[in-house]
From Swiss-Prot:
Positions of disulphide bridges: C50-C110, C64-C122, C82-C137, C89-C98
Protein name: Non-secretory ribonuclease
Keywords: Disulfide bond, Endonuclease, Glycoprotein, Hydrolase, Lyase, Lysosome, Nitration, Nuclease, Signal
A molecular function (GO) term: lyase activity
Catalytic activities: an [RNA] containing cytidine + H2O = an [RNA]-3'-cytidine-3'-phosphate + a 5'-hydroxy-ribonucleotide-3'-[RNA]; an [RNA] containing uridine + H2O = an [RNA]-3'-uridine-3'-phosphate + a 5'-hydroxy-ribonucleotide-3'-[RNA]
Function: This is a non-secretory ribonuclease. It is a pyrimidine specific nuclease with a slight preference for U. Cytotoxin and helminthotoxin. Possesses a wide variety of biological activities.
Gene name per UniProt: RNASE2
Amino acid sequence: MVPKLFTSQICLLLLLGLMGVEGSLHAKPGQFTWAQWFEIQHINMTSGQCTNAMQVINNYQRRCKNQNTFLLTTFADVVHVCGNPSMPCPSNTSLNNCHHSGVQVPLIHCNLTTPSRRISNCRYTQTTANKYYIVACNNSDPVRDPPQYPVVPVHLDRII
């Protein structure tokens, strides 16, 4: 009985540890609201090259993100998409706070090709396209988000 219980506890701890690691990969840095983090990750492409642009995101997360999509549009335009009819989110159909862009936008998709423990050594390839997108939206943080946007994008759910 003791070895079986001990083994079960070890398995549970390993599972919880893995879930914690997976959860932390999708976590936002604490100093940002979800809308601010969305803007950093998906709107503010600080450089025309993925390798340079991804360093900003990677520095906040302290790891090299495997892939990321930058929408070449404005935050205000994505906020406007939040006004489109709600739909179930493709990545989690139990959530009904997603909205289809309705128009294609230019975008750049960054894909990690050279991983490294040292963030500055990570390298990315980039692909450009014009595609629709689906974004999840929530009520804004009344203190830290721009007051003109009561509902804001918080997650890029799908590119189509």
